[in-house]
Amino acid sequence: MFIGIVSLFPEMFRAITDYGVTGRAVKNGLLSVQCWSPRDFTYDRHRTVDDRPYGGGPGMLMMVQPLREAIHAAKAAAGEGAKVIYLSPQGRKLDHTGVCELAANQKMILVCGRYEGIDERVIQTEIDEEWSIGDYVLSGGELPAMTLIDSVARFIPGVLGHQASAEEDSFADGLLDCPHYTRPEVLEGMEVPPVLLSGNHAEIRRWRLKQSLGRTWLRRPELLESLALTDEQAVLLAEFQREHQARQQDYEGNV
């Protein structure tokens, strides 16, 4: 996968290219990340990349000419078929479904805004899609771009040690992930659930599914509203709810 980045701070993306899962993907040739800075397309001695907005008001906008030239350079390097994405609070909110859609692209160019944003005409002429990572404001589009890259890269074949890792992550089936445990078996008096030590793979799968359903019900109940539960899932969720209610009653009785 090729990902081009247009950013005033390309050095920030070393967090993606040099470290962790994405760093290994770059090293192994599964992911190519290249950056273009609008500053490299300025023609004044101050390398100016911001300009005043028409109509006044606080803040500045990214200057049109260097931004467009940087986007054009990224498009030329990417070749045909590259989707140009602007990271913006006004964009579609990134979720698991969106990540899967984006992962189907072989080429993407991510445009990272700064200041108060970019000229609307640049959006109309250069941008294919706008994406957001949440209903809050950041200083620029670099962190959202890194979030998008990290989430999408997990779906590139060969990036993860086991492809099942991506398939079993939270939200992969519309549910939150189940609890996980590693050594030691006992930590400050808290034991690993015995079923995970049993070696019974069918029971382990059942336990994990029940915990996943229960955790979703407790923490993100709205996710369940959009799911058509299987008969097994409905039974397991009902079991979890009964067990949770019993624990709550025991706790209240001991307080």
Swiss-Prot record:
<dbReference type="GO" id="GO:0052906">
    <property type="term" value="F:tRNA (guanine(37)-N1)-methyltransferase activity"/>
</dbReference>
<feature type="binding site">
    <location>
        <begin position="133"/>
        <end position="138"/>
    </location>
    <ligand>
        <name>S-adenosyl-L-methionine</name>
    </ligand>
</feature>
<dbReference type="GO" id="GO:0005829">
    <property type="term" value="C:cytosol"/>
</dbReference>
<dbReference type="InterPro" id="IPR029028">
    <property type="entry name" value="Alpha/beta_knot_MTases"/>
</dbReference>
<dbReference type="Pfam" id="PF01746">
    <property type="entry name" value="tRNA_m1G_MT"/>
</dbReference>
<protein>
    <recommendedName>
        <fullName>tRNA (guanine-N(1)-)-methyltransferase</fullName>
        <ecNumber>2.1.1.228</ecNumber>
    </recommendedName>
</protein>
<comment type="similarity">
    <text>Belongs to the RNA methyltransferase TrmD family.</text>
</comment>
<keyword id="KW-0949">S-adenosyl-L-methionine</keyword>
<keyword id="KW-0808">Transferase</keyword>
<keyword id="KW-0489">Methyltransferase</keyword>
<dbReference type="GO" id="GO:0002939">
    <property type="term" value="P:tRNA N1-guanine methylation"/>
</dbReference>
<dbReference type="InterPro" id="IPR023148">
    <property type="entry name" value="tRNA_m1G_MeTrfase_C_sf"/>
</dbReference>
<keyword id="KW-0963">Cytoplasm</keyword>
<feature type="binding site">
    <location>
        <position position="113"/>
    </location>
    <ligand>
        <name>S-adenosyl-L-methionine</name>
    </ligand>
</feature>
<comment type="function">
    <text>Specifically methylates guanosine-37 in various tRNAs.</text>
</comment>
<comment type="subunit">
    <text>Homodimer.</text>
</comment>
<dbReference type="InterPro" id="IPR029026">
    <property type="entry name" value="tRNA_m1G_MTases_N"/>
</dbReference>
<dbReference type="InterPro" id="IPR002649">
    <property type="entry name" value="tRNA_m1G_MeTrfase_TrmD"/>
</dbReference>
<keyword id="KW-0819">tRNA processing</keyword>
<dbReference type="InterPro" id="IPR016009">
    <property type="entry name" value="tRNA_MeTrfase_TRMD/TRM10"/>
</dbReference>
